[in-house]
Regions:
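Bacterial Sec-dependent N-terminal signal peptides
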Residues: 1-26
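Loop/turn elements at helix/coil->beta-strand transitions in domains of secreted/extracellular proteins
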Residues: 26-31, 61-66, 92, 145-150, ...
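Beta-strand elements within well-structured catalytic alpha/beta cores of enzymes
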Residues: 27-39, 58, 84, 140, ...
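Second-shell loop/turn segments in exported
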Residues: 39-45, 68-71, 121-128, 245-252, ...
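Short, structured active-site-proximal loop/turn typified by the sulfatase FGly-forming signature C/S-X-P-X-R
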Residues: 43-92, 149-153
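Secreted, luminal/periplasmic, and some membrane-associated catalytic domains
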Residues: 67, 76, 98-123, 133, ...
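His/Asp/Glu-rich, glycine-adjacent segments
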Residues: 89, 97-276, 285-292, 413-415, ...
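Substrate-binding rim/cap in mid-to-C-terminal beta-strand-loop elements of soluble/periplasmic
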Residues: 359-398, 467-509, 523-527
Length: 527
């Protein structure tokens, strides 16, 4: 009997020891790189132009999901980054876009505005106050009792702050007016190593000498069809009158600036230097220059990917040299949208037209006055959304549900409108895959009372924001790539959800997932 018990104990000990040996260690560092407007099809299309250290290394050594998808529509930088690091949609995390209408003041606010905190090296007052749930960085700080090193570095303010979350030790972005790395007093005292970088190596000392031209011979750039015949291109950033820093942030050199500050961070902080896991959230840019179309800048977008390939290679080498890629879990993904191309030339006879949201609001108000009497029933409008005057409706003791239904039925009769969804229909109505995506974009406290879905090919003219957008619902492929820390190399084309990133990383760091991240972690990623 004793021998049997002893044998069982030895067997249990051996099995436990083997499991401990085969369980991958917690990564010393996690690096998340979100590349604005990165496209899987462009990565593949321009592959003949790449070296061996960037995309090709990712394809050889990484686990590559070629079709990663967001569970909501109207994606932009803010909503995408918030979704990645919270593991949920705008319906829960509160970040419905870069900007939205504030119901109380009827003014447009930006996703990271907060007058309660002062900017550092910037006049912009910033915090993540609009982010309503926890992020991956928040959960790491809680799990390590604040001992983890968590920093966020990005060309743009919203990408830096929303990736940093509420509890990071710092979020840094390039100032649109000075080129200095900026921050917010929300994150406490501004690090001395960033101040030193600004004083000694700041972009403002070098930008006048930077010129963006083709990295390769111009005959190499033949992978984007365009009517515009480009012989070459040349962009400099020396003219003070042309918002040079904003344009710089849409060039590939912005990615190199991120790498420079990452190098300083790894040199002057404790990131990756002890057994407490740390987190760096980074952002790059991969859209077209000055947010113009590929038709205008076909050569630039190809050169952008060539230089992006170099920047990724430099970053991988930097992490490998300073921390060790085997000690690092590195993931790369995209914001999943692209800047909208202009209206198609009329000669091709593609159906379309113009939908004016201001006219829509005015006509709707006239219609409601004809039924319910005088009054300003439409309070305002913004980004294909109508905001009704709830106080007036309450004062008149009218039925809100009836007004919402009448309004939706009226708007859907307008030219160019495919559907009109009331807030009640989105919250309480029947489920369809399309309604689910729209609902995930919607937030009851921020969004309008009626969401208008405009036909593809039509231009939405928003007089309030002075922006005209062509509606295009075509699929845009976005990648999700893992590399380092025992990652199993494989290329997969099965669609995966971006919402799985936060729970997957949390699983491998052995911490809680963010508090609204309900998706299960991806499996089979590590050896």
């Amino acid at each position: 009997m004793k021998e049997r018990i002893l044998t069982s104990l030895i067997a249990a000990f051996v099995i436990t020891s083997l499991q401990a040996q085969t369980t991958p260690a917690v990564p010393r560092l996690v690096v998340g790189l979100t590349i604005d407007q990165l496209r899987s099809d462009y990565i593949e299309a321009f592959s003949a132009l790449y070296g061996e250290r960037g995309f090709k290394r990712l394809m050889r050594e990484g686990r590559v999901y070629c079709n990663a998808e967001y569970d909501f529509i109207n994606i932009d930088r803010s909503s995408a980054v918030a979704s990645i690091y919270t593991g949920t949609t705008p319906y829960y995390n509160g970040i419905v876009g870069n900007r939205w209408m504030d119901r109380a003041s009827l003014r447009i606010i930006k996703s990271v505005d907060d007058p309660a905190y002062m900017g550092v090296y910037t006049s912009e007052s910033t915090s993540p106050q609009h982010l309503l749930v926890s992020t991956l960085s928040d959960e790491l700080m809680v799990a390590t009792c604040g001992n983890a090193e968590v920093y966020s570095i990005a060309p743009t303010r919203e990408m830096a702050v929303l990736a940093a979350g509420h509890a990071a030790k710092g979020a840094f972005w390039l100032n649109d007016e000075t080129g200095k790395w900026s921050g917010s007093t929300y994150y406490g005292s501004f690090p001395e190593w960033v101040t030193t970088y600004n004083d000694r190596d700041g972009l403002d000392f070098r930008i006048g000498n930077l010129v963006w031209g083709p990295y390769l011979p111009v005959t190499s750039y033949k992978y984007v069809t365009s009517d515009a015949k480009q012989l070459t291109f040349k962009h400099d950033f020396s003219d003070e009158r042309t918002e040079k820093y904003k344009k710089f942030k849409t060039s590939p050199y912005a990615n190199d600036e991120v790498n420079k500050l990452v190098d300083a961070c790894l040199t002057y902080t404790n990131v990756g230097k002890d057994n407490v896991p740390d987190l760096l959230t980074l952002s790059y840019y991969a859209g077209n220059y000055a947010h113009m179309s590929n038709a205008e800048y076909a050569m630039e977008i190809q050169d952008m990917y060539v230089r992006l390939d170099n920047s990724i290679g430099d970053l991988l080498d930097l992490i490998d040299r300073k921390v060790g890629l085997n000690n690092t879990l590195f993931f790369i993904t995209s914001t999943g949208y692209t800047d909208v191309d202009p209206k198609d030339p009329e000669q091709y006879k593609i159906p379309g037209g113009e939908f004016h949201i201001k006219r829509c609001g005015a006509l709707l108000n006239m219609y409601l006055m004809a039924i319910y009497g005088p009054g300003q029933y439409v309070e305002t409008y913004y980004d294909r959304q109508i905001y009704l005057n709830h106080k007036l409706i309450e004062d008149k003791k009218l039925n809100l549900t009836e007004i919402l239904n009448r309004s939706s039925d009226f708007i859907v009769q307008m030219s160019g409108v495919r559907s009109a969804y009331s807030s009640q229909r989105l919250l309480l109505g029947a489920w369809t895959p399309r309604i689910d995506k729209i609902r995930n974009t919607f937030n009851p406290h921020l969004s309008g009372d009626i969401y208008i879905e405009v036909m593809p090919g039509w231009s939405v003219v928003d007089e309030y924001s002075q922006v005209t957008k062509v509606v295009r619902d075509n699929y845009s492929s976005a990648p999700l790539i893992f590399i380092g820390n025992n990652i199993k190399p494989e290329i997969l084309y099965t669609p995966v959800k971006m919402a799985t990133i936060a729970s997957t990383i949390a699983h491998f760091m052995r911490i809680r997932a963010p508090n609204a991240a309900t998706a299960a972690p991806l499996t089979g990623i590590r050896k």
